[in-house]
Regions:
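N-terminal Rossmann NAD(P)H-binding glycine-rich loop of SDR-like oxidoreductase domains
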Residues: 2-25
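Short glycine-/acidic-enriched loop or helix-start segments at secondary-structure transitions
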Residues: 15-16, 39, 82-83, 124-128
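Structural motif
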Residues: 2, 69-70, 113
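Short, glycine/serine-rich, charged loops/turns that create anion-binding
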Residues: 10, 34-35, 79, 121
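NAD(P)H-binding glycine-rich loop region in Rossmannoid oxidoreductase-like domains
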Residues: 29, 36-98, 102-103
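SDR active-site strand-loop-helix element
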Residues: 6, 30, 74-75, 114-120
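Conserved Rossmann-fold NAD(P)-dependent oxidoreductase catalytic core, especially the SDR/UDP-sugar
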Residues: 95-134
Length: 134
């Protein structure tokens, strides 16, 4: 299966990449800064797409141009932990959903499997004295 992995340079995404490769998936990395991908990881990728995880058109184009069967979103986890704004988290998730839906519709309605690391948003964070989504 060809998988578009958003957030491959982050804490979660960098751990998901070896797992996807171990299960013989072809991985297309979607990143803002390709230089952050280690040379070892780069050698295992099918391809690299540079873009913003909050850009609907870029996500849709990546899915369609690389003929991805699935999307795994590990982007935006830093937005939930206070490292960036909470608004970025919502924008990323909305863009991934919309871009994936539009890509599926353009393919004639064929479903695209999609996994989100959204459960992290309800976890307690050491950076804040309260739940992230009170």
């Amino acid at each position: 299966m060809k998988v578009l992995l958003l957030g491959v340079t982050g804490n979660v995404g960098s751990r998901m990449l070896p797992a996807l490769i171990a299960h013989e998936h072809q991985v297309v990395a979607f990143v803002r800064t390709p230089a952050k991908i280690s040379p070892e990881a780069t050698s295992k990728l099918d391809s690299i797409v540079v873009g913003s995880a909050s850009d609907i058109a870029a996500i849709k184009a990546a899915i369609l141009s690389h003929n991805c069967d699935a999307v795994v979103n590990a982007a935006g986890v830093a937005a939930m932990t206070g490292l960036t704004s909470q608004g970025e988290f919502a924008a990323i998730f909305a863009a991934v959903v919309q871009g994936t839906l539009e890509a599926g519709q353009e393919r004639g309605g064929a479903p695209i499997r999609c996994w989100f690391m959204s459960g992290f948003g309800i976890l307690d964070s050491p950076k804040k004295p309260y739940l992230l989504l009170d």
